[in-house]
Each structure stands twice: as C-alpha cells, then as structure tokens.
Amino acid sequence: MNYEAEQPGANDDASGVAVALELARVLAKRKPAATIVFAAVAGEEQGLLGAQFMAQTFKNASVNVEGMLNVDLVGSSVGSRGEKEPNTVRLFCQGPPLTETPAQASQRLSIGGENDSPARQLGRFITEVAANKFTDMRVAMIYRLDRFLRGGDHRPFLEAGYAAVRFTEPNENFDHQHQDTRVEDGVQYGDLPEFLDYEYIARVAKVDLAAMWSLANAPAKVNNVRVNGTWLSNDSQLFWDPVNSTNLAGYEVVWRPTDAPLWTHALFVGDVRTATVELSKDNVIFGVRSVGKNGYKSPVTIPFPT
C-alpha cells in the first residue's frame, strides 16, 4: 500500500471501534458488578504497539483481567468468492498458554489439557452465553491464535498471561483489505463503507454485549482447581480454592468427552470446596466454575493433579 496516501479503514477496523463505541453508549447508565473497559488502541499494523502498552499497563498494576475480547474485522459477512454467512462470527482461541513454563506445558500435555487453556475456556464461555436466538448468531470457535500466520491486538494480552480471544467475520474479502483505493479492471478495491453490512455488525455487537455483560456480572473464576491424582478409583475427587464474592451461590462441576468442543454436562454441588463425581478422569475432561446468585456463571477452570 501507499503509506503516504490516506486510506479508509471502514472494516479494518472501524467496524470493531464502532462496536466498542455503541456498547459503551448502551452500557453507560448501567452498573455491572465488575469494571468493563472499552479501548481502541493504535499501532496494530506497526507491531501491536497500543495493545502491548495496554496489556503491560494492566500487568504492571496487577489488574485482574478476566477476559479480553478483540473485535477486529467484523464488518461484512461476504467473502472474496461471494460466499455469505450472515449469522456466523469466528472466534479465535489460542491453545496452550504462551506464558507456560516447559514444566507446566509438559504437565498440561500429560493430562490431555491442550484444548483447555484459559483462552479456550473464555471461548467456550462466549459460545454458551452469546450464541442464541437473541443474537441470532453462531459463534464458530477456531482453535488457533489468529488467522493463519497472522495476529491481532489480543496477542499482547495472551503474552501478559490474560485470557484473550479475537472476533472476526467468517469470510474475508481481500479486495477490501490492505488495498489502495482504486478501480482496476472494473473491480473496486479499498476498505470502503459501501462494502459493510451494518445489520451484521449489529449482530456481532449483541454477541459481544452478551459475553462481556455475563462475564462482568458472574463471580470470579475458580482458582487452584485440583484433581486427586494418587487415588486409584473410577470416581474423581476435585478440590478448589473458595471464590470471595457476596454474589456466590456455589459451584458447578462440568465435564465433556475428551473429543467434544463444548461442555456437555454440569452438576451443581453447592457452596463447597470439594466434590466427588462418579466418573473416571480417564474418560472425560473435568472443570469447575462459580455460579452467582444472579444466575451468571464464570468461565471454567480445569483441574491439575495433586
């Protein structure tokens, strides 16, 4: 591209900024239980500069960030070949955390937890709370940091140890992305407003709103979840640290087959610190989440062996 010429960025990423501005307006007079921060950061194309500064600012101040939602390129549901998916948004979710030590990564692999990073738990949480008849959207979880060999502003948050994911439209049109505005062989190039689908952007905004509101009003994630690794039994014994919240109603133990993308079962066990489930830890992935008196639930935390 000609870096000396002004170029529009209607989709990349005025669409995401528009979502943030509209949701900030909608929520301005409401009071979530936790703080929701809306931000439009600069310098993404120059090396994720704004996002790096923001993530490090939070980390240096020891801010508890329950989740970061990067909304980037959500302006159109029509791809380069004319394919249309007006009710789908992609959600990119990183696998094993970028901050894990070799020993931590080895333990994760030994228990089959490579698909259960904090980012993927955030992705499952978003899918559960935001893919419904009210948003009229399907959230397509992609098990990858970002599009193939590409990146975005959520990466610095992952590198800082936070759960972070990226929303992106289902099919990109590269005639309208990273292009000088021009007409060539009868084809209009450039990231122009005329190529946006505003109803699609509104549906993506509903997905984001459902996710962030649910996250902000749920009790905090459960920490230090363990499973008894020395007990030879077909039952599974789980332990966890208590969540300090006046909104806490109790905890749910969840599980799914090892090859299932989403949680398939949930068992409310009350306000306790341990639970024994009549299932073998060999055959399923377990997790624990907090449940609020208001009905909101936290993202899941998987157990590691004692």
UniProtKB/Swiss-Prot annotation:
GO terms for molecular function: metal ion binding; metalloexopeptidase activity. Its cofactor is Zn(2+). Glycans are attached at N60, N228, N234, N244. Its EC number is 3.4.-.-. Binds 2 Zn(2+) ions per subunit. PROSITE patterns: FN3. GO terms for biological process: proteolysis. Belongs to the peptidase M28 family. M28B subfamily. This is Probable zinc metalloprotease VDBG_06923. It comes from Verticillium alfalfae (strain VaMs.102 / ATCC MYA-4576 / FGSC 10136) (Verticillium wilt of alfalfa).
